[in-house]
Amino acid sequence: MATEQRPFQLVVFGASGFTGQFVTEEVAREQMASEQSSRLPWAVAGRSKEKLQQVLEKAAQKLGRATLSSEVGIIICDISNPASLDEMAKKATLVLNCVGPYRFYGEPVVKACIENGTSCIDICGEPQFLELMHVKYHEKAAEKGVYIIGSSGFDSIPADLGVLYTRNQMNGTLTAVESFLTINSGPEGLCIHDGTWKSAIYGFGDKGSLRKLRSVSNLKPVPVIGSKLKRRWPVSYCRELNSYAIPFLGSDMSVVKRTQRYLHENLEDSPVQYAAYITVGGITSVIKLMFAGLFFLFFVKFSIGRQLLVKFPWLFSFGYFSKRGPTQKQMDESSFTMTFFGQGYSHGVSAEKNKPNIRICTQVKGPEAGYVATPIAMVQAAVTFLNDASDLPKGGGVFTPGAAFSRTKLIDRLNQHGIQFSVISSSEV
């Protein structure tokens, strides 16, 4: 509930950025769909008042709500000015942080939110940042009773909650899951804003930091229940989907593993093994992708190479990334499907002495991943946080979406907003 000290329940930070403008629009859409009595006071935040006003005016025009600009607060805030971050945090119950790459701009927001007793949700897909924030700030956030919830966009809500959904739908104990992401596009093809491209460049260019972080974490291994999940080759064929697949290099593996660790250590849930892949079509696509991948991995090793990759995203990504991002038509014609193949054991069957005897297939389907599904996921995570507080982990801390929302109604809300979870098949073998 908003108070005189905290006039806004929700603040969208980075609202004038490429992704932030879509998150702003989605918050406005959610507010319009709510009854008057349940609408939340909210604001947008960023460096330029003029740009923030333009974002609100654009959303107002698109949604047909002429009064939107007068209904939403504006906070001037700069990532390079800690005092302005503090002032923003003091005015909000929850900050939706849309400013990336997070490895460069994320930590000051996390720090300001914790110091000022404000919770924060981001849409980061960078494992190094996500894991570092947990190591550095989990205890501090818990002491303050605030929640820092990362990767609450397309990275990695479909994967993280998809595994939990699969577990909940299995009539037995789920022990292992493989997910296969398929991106669908229309005649005009796919295009992704270069902010995601930059995050990938700097992430691959600094893989050593993530390895070092994990090596000093001293975490106990999570037990393997049942048959060990075999990793596929770098290029494998998925017969069920009639497509070649490669490992998915986003944050899904990191996030799901952290969720499974949390649920096992804190709620005594049986941990689930996980592997993430993305389908790439036929053999011609595989060959093209191999050349592109080798090209990228060579350039990303060197400073000058990274500068070239950042400067010419369209050239080096073969047209998939650009500084302008996708057109509205490209977004309208795009969608994603994430298919989960799970295995486990029926009740009463020992996982120690037997092979898995249950198979289950589930799917998560949704609209364009980066700028339609991501805002939906982020905003519904925020709505869930604000409305299902009693079902969140007790005491605060730094969490994955699955750890934070495993006992909430987030999946139900996503189903109602176009990100659909469903069971395709389930059988004993």
From Swiss-Prot:
E.C. designation(s): 1.-.-.-
GO cellular component: lipid droplet; membrane; midbody
Pfam families: Sacchrp_dh_NADP
Keywords on record: Acetylation, Oxidoreductase, Phosphoprotein
Keyword Isomerase among UniProt keywords: no
Modified residues (N-acetylalanine): 2
GO molecular function (one): oxidoreductase activity
Keyword GTP-binding part of the UniProt annotation: no
InterPro entries: NAD(P)-bd_dom_sf (IPR036291), Saccharopine_DH-like_oxidrdct (IPR051276), Sacchrp_dh_NADP-bd (IPR005097)
BP-aspect Gene Ontology terms: glycolipid biosynthetic process
Membership in a protein family: Belongs to the saccharopine dehydrogenase family.
PANTHER family the record matches: SACCHAROPINE DEHYDROGENASE-LIKE OXIDOREDUCTASE (PTHR12286:SF5)
Listed name of the protein: Saccharopine dehydrogenase-like oxidoreductase
Taxonomic lineage of the native organism: Eukaryota, Metazoa, Chordata, Craniata, Vertebrata
